[in-house]
Structure formats: structure tokens, C-alpha cells
Amino acid sequence: MSQFHWTVQRVDQLERAIRDQRRVAVNRRGTEYLVIALRMSTVRQRDAFVGRHPMTGEEMTFILDELESFQVVS
């Protein structure tokens, strides 16, 4: 279970970051990722977002209720 609570305001921040393709920092299972937010998605009926690693171009999917933290950084 996530220690991080998704409020309406935080989801709005994520959606704005996706619209503007901004960088976001997320923690999942003790690892921090810095990615460019691309789009919302679902994985096995769970809300998620897809981000692109800025150095490698790899697309990564993050299930929202698995994240420990989230922050828009640029």
C-alpha cells in the first residue's frame, strides 16, 4: 500500500505536467526516477502514468498507488 496519498490537487499537477511535458521526480520502492511526463494510462485497471527517461528515451510506466512520492521539478 502506498504511503503517498493522491489528492485532487496532486492529480491536477500530474495532468498539467503531462500536458506541458515537464519533468517529474517520483519514488517507487526506494528508487528515485526523474522522467518527462508523457500520458496517463491504466494497467490492470489501476491508474498510471507514462514517463520518458531524458537520457535514454526509455518509456517507463508508473502505477500511481505504488508511488511513495511525486514532485514536478521543472
Language-model features and meaning:
Residues 45-50:
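Short aromatic-glycine-enriched beta-strand elements
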Residues 61-74:
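Structured surface patches comprising rigid loops and adjacent beta-strands/short helices at the edges
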Residues 28-30, 44, 55:
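A generic beta-sheet turn/junction motif
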Residues 26-34, 60-63:
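Short coil-to-beta-strand transition motifs
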Residues 18-28:
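A short, Trp-centered hydrophobic/proline-enriched beta-strand micro-motif
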Residues 33-41:
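Short beta-strand-centered aromatic/proline hotspots
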Residues 1-17:
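Mixed-charge, Lys/Arg-rich low-complexity intrinsically disordered regions
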Residues 51-60:
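Short solvent-exposed strand/turn elements
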